[in-house]
Amino acid sequence: MNEQYSAMRSNVSMLGKLLGDTIKEALGEHILDRVETIRKLSKSSRAGNEAHRQELLSTLQNLSNDELLPVARAFSQFLNLTNVAEQYHSISPNGEAASNPEALAQLFTRLKDKKLSTKELQNAVSQLSIELVLTAHPTEITRRTLIHKLVEVNTCLSQLDHNDLADYERNKIMRRLRQLVAQSWHTDEIRKHRPSPIDEAKWGFAVVENSLWEGVPAFLREFNEQLENSIDYSLPAEAVPVRFTSWMGGDRDGNPNVTAEITRHVLLLSRWKACDLFTRDIQVLVSELSMTECTPELRARAGGDEVQEPYREIMKQLRSQLMSSQAYLEGRLKGERVLKPHDLLVNNEQLWEPLFACYQSLQACGMSIIANGQLLDTLRRVRCFGVPLVRIDVRQESTRHTEAIAELTRYLGLGDYESWSEADKQAFLIRELNSKRPLVPLKWEPSADTQEVLETCRVIAEAPQGSIAAYVISMARTPSDVLAVHLLLKEAGCPFALPVAPLFETLDDLNNADDVMTQLLNIDWYRGFIQGKQMVMIGYSDSAKDAGVMAASWAQYRAQDALIKTCEKAGVALTLFHGRGGSIGRGGAPAHAALLSQPPGSLKGGLRVTEQGEMIRFKFGLPEVTISSLALYTGAILEANLLPPPEPKKEWRALMDDLSDTSCKMYRGYVRENPEFVPYFRAATPELELGKLPLGSRPAKRKPNGGVESLRAIPWIFAWTQNRLMLPAWLGAGAGLQEAVKAGKQDQLEAMCRDWPFFSTRIAMLEMVFAKADLWLAEYYDQRLVDKSLWPLGQQLRDQLASDIKVVLTIANDAHLMEDLPWIAESIALRNVYTDPLNVLQAELLHRSRQQEQPDARVEQALMVTIAGVAAGMRNTG
């Protein structure tokens, strides 16, 4: 491990030196000296030198408006380069993630030691299902332009790791690194315009093209090797346990920019991109598959005896089919009237069948070494990505469906659906779902909002089957919320049964989730329609914002536990869909820990989880990182299903109920009930300024003028991460633990920490947040930005944080934070030296910006850069 630290530190200092040279060349010695002085003061301040801390503050406060931007950019870019070095070291030959695939082999050994039979292991592998849902959360601050350059920096670091480089080769790589660092410095890191939903979708396709396209088959190849060595099992060509879905272009919850027309466009664009990528694959196969020997069936398919190279012939036919489909889709995207080709690709079988026929023929003719090369990779891509490339989820808020149906019932003279009781709503919906006649009149002209809801359902109905994965209903509260969507889809003429997933996301809704699903499963029509399969989405970010992280995580656990048992009893296969964020206040946690901390049985129906904004780049930004992330997920799911965690003891559950109540009261006491809290929040964080950042296509608020409750979960977390108080990720949790310790429950808490993965993960997550939080910086924001009358509130919160840290260390039996994860502690320490000056500078800039009559472009731009820089330093935004 130490070897890895020193290798990483030397790369970090090399990249830092290259950045320094670039700054000196661009802006002269004076600015570089200024940056270097600040860096040294920051390092010394971190080591506890109080005089240097004061000097750091005065140096940053006294920067002229012309110096602000270069200094902010220097530290921000440095943190981006540090993240690249760290990502590289996590996958370098001796790094931690490089061993994830080997960890699978160790897992199989452990499973065998537990006396699990090879048959049981093979069954678990054959049922494996991982669906990762990419979302365009506005937290990916880094521009795509810069991401490409940073990816190439990673490639250079990997080339430098070869021991046998000649001097001229090393010089060539170093020259390229200099160019990349200079290009990044001379590129504006802040977007000038908000991305449109279509830009976001293109960003998602770029992740597929640049990373997943190579990463998924490479992972399956490694996984297959482990399986053959460990349990004598080979993955069949058609077994691809990994799939990707996207919310980009489908998630319209609170985002008026995502319309039915946008969804239609993104579906076409996605198919166009799939044609593009598969054409490249087939092009390679045309040159590779020059063999002449084949089975009689394949020869007939290729055109009979006169065809010399049957495999090539089939690949060429497929290539022309892909190209004509792509041309048709391009015409549609441009809005032209185009003739549909007779062999238009609409489903995966059209791609799979000819490719698999070639695969079987090569196997039959003794050429399996060729069959299992590039051709197998392409077959696996057909199974993973296929004709749609990524499927999309449509997400809409429950009240939009209620309002649409109410408008219809009023028009038809049936009364006002919105004012009916739940029982009356259900009776009406079930009657209409059973009815053979349409409900929506042809000549009806509804309001624009209702028209939009109906049009979205029509887009789903027209889309080729398999291109839409699910319809998610946010803020779902009642059975009628689910039935309403089924009725709207039926009215749109949807020819297939689309999974409709209620999303339970506030504390009350999580507590009622089991009741709602029990009622639904007792409805005969519903039981018949779902054919034994149900998806339910659990919301992490909104529940944490509503009740605090301790109460929310316990409500999520209990809801999942109850749903698993209810569905098991009803004989329904349940897929739990986890809406986790990247940050801990939004349910984020290292994948392995998060999955093993769920209730027993929660992964039987496979894993479906959102991968958000900035986390997509950290987990799937490079093919090698993709392999490592997928290996982690695979291992965790197999372990959770084959060695499920024990059911928590009764007294542990009772103690969690108490912790949850105490922590929720404390959290809401501040956030909802303290009249000073919202003014303090707005002053002490850059919340108002964040609204100006052109991050995502979605507005930061559900309602333009509401308080904290109307803020989306992401800006809420983002703002507190910036001022280093990290409040949403801990407030209330420590208070609950302190009460329990006072009540003499410390031994019990320690036992829970040792023996219950759910609880130990909660404690580990608190430690991680505490390690990133910083009391003196949070206090500095107060001094620079907050009215003196609100200072006592800030002091109270910081005192609470300090005592929370003590109680968590006591329960975990740790001498200091992150004792069990020295790699992460090292990484945070390394970054703090560069993040601290950005925080101090940000507080200064907020102070200047709020004092100005007229905004100064230099101050505004530098402020945006510090926000991006702190986000890079914290490794997550919202």
From Swiss-Prot:
What InterPro entries does its record include? PEP_COase, PEP_COase_bac/pln-type, PEP_COase_Lys_AS, PEPCASE_His_AS, Pyrv/PenolPyrv_kinase-like_dom
Catalysis: reaction(s): oxaloacetate + phosphate = phosphoenolpyruvate + hydrogencarbonate
What family is this protein classified in? Belongs to the PEPCase type 1 family.
| Organism the protein comes from | Serratia proteamaculans (strain 568)
Q: What is the lineage of its organism?
A: Bacteria, Pseudomonadati, Pseudomonadota, Gammaproteobacteria, Enterobacterales
GO terms of molecular function? magnesium ion binding; phosphoenolpyruvate carboxylase activity
Q: Which GO terms describe its cellular component?
A: cytosol
Q: Which EC class does it fall in? A: lyase
Please name the catalytic residues of this protein.
137, 545
**What are its GO biological-process terms?**
carbon fixation; oxaloacetate metabolic process; tricarboxylic acid cycle
| Names of the cofactor(s) | Mg(2+)
Q: Which gene encodes it?
A: ppc
- Keywords from the UniProt entry: Carbon dioxide fixation, Lyase, Magnesium
- Which Pfam families does the protein's record reference? PEPcase (PF00311)
- Under what name is this protein listed? Phosphoenolpyruvate carboxylase
Q: What's the Enzyme Commission number for this chain?
A: 4.1.1.31
- Which SUPFAM superfamilies does the protein's record reference? Phosphoenolpyruvate/pyruvate domain
Q: Please indicate if the UniProt record lists Glycoprotein as a keyword.
A: no
Q: What is the documented function of this protein?
A: Forms oxaloacetate, a four-carbon dicarboxylic acid source for the tricarboxylic acid cycle.
Q: Does the keyword Lyase apply?
A: yes
